[in-house]
Amino acid sequence: MNKKNQWIVGINAVVSSIENDAEHVREVLVEAASKNSRLLDIEENARRKGIEVRRVTTQALDGVGGGVRHQGVAARYAAVRLWEEHDLKDLVDAAGGQALLLVLDGVQDPHNLGACLRSAAAAGVTAVIIPKDKSVGINATVRKTSSGAADRLPVIAVVNLARSLRELQKQDVWIYGLAGEVETSLYALDLRGNVALVLGGEADGLRRLTREHCDVLARIPMPGEVESLNVSVAAGVTLFEAVRQRTLV
């Protein structure tokens, strides 16, 4: 298990981190010259929870933001676990036959990845799996877009996605891939039990080897004239169909 300090920037991301995971927020930086009342609320909330707050210059915030629009606030987030590929088996085992995994095969846009992670956190997924290559990693933009979910979810970057899917199948995880050209509907699938939902990248969808390692390929029915959805929208639709099935009485 590796740990390191990381910066989260933007009002929503910082608010979410303070409210949901204050024990890992080490300090909050607030732009001294700002008149934004929301920053005052953040400062008061952070102090109530025992988090150090410092008023700093815009230039200081620019430095920790790495070019991402910080909206006058940043938080230093410490002791975030960096999940490793070998952790995946333990996570699935710990889910007790109810693992829900989101697999993103080559998502390149950090805003899309962040939005997917936010939906995944809301759906209560066990872990998110991404390839180490041909995919955006966890960066400041992803953290901001995810409203802090990127640092609370197990996000596992794997060297060989096809191999990881094979290992999941050995743990009795059903692998369902989303593809627009097939006949099987998402709503015909049984998404209870151990399930991995696999979505492709923005440009090319699922890669060939990824498709070949899916147990079933399905599509999201779209009666309108648009033939595809943004990957983050598709992830939300798919995840919450699984949630619906799992929570039916």
Curated annotation (Swiss-Prot):
Asked if the Swiss-Prot or TrEMBL record annotates the protein with the keyword Transferase, the reply is yes
What Pfam families does the database record attribute to this sequence?
Answer: SpoU_methylase, SpoU_sub_bind
Listed name of the protein: 23S rRNA (guanosine-2'-O-)-methyltransferase RlmB
Q: Which CDD domains match?
A: SpoU-like_RlmB (cd18103)
Please name the gene that encodes this protein.
Answer: rlmB
Spans traversing the lipid bilayer: none
The subcellular localization recorded is: Cytoplasm
Taxonomy of origin reads: Bacteria, Pseudomonadati, Pseudomonadota, Gammaproteobacteria, Lysobacterales
Against InterPro entries, the record matches this protein to: 23S_rRNA_MeTrfase_RlmB (IPR024915), Alpha/beta_knot_MTases (IPR029028), Ribosomal_eL30-like_sf (IPR029064), rRNA_MeTrfase_TrmH (IPR004441), SpoU_MeTrfase (IPR001537), SpoU_subst-bd (IPR013123), tRNA_m1G_MTases_N (IPR029026)
In this chain, S-adenosyl-L-methionine is annotated as bound at: G200, I220, L229
Q: Name one GO molecular function term.
A: rRNA (guanosine-2'-O-)-methyltransferase activity
Q: What's this protein's family per the entry?
A: Belongs to the class IV-like SAM-binding methyltransferase superfamily. RNA methyltransferase TrmH family. RlmB subfamily.
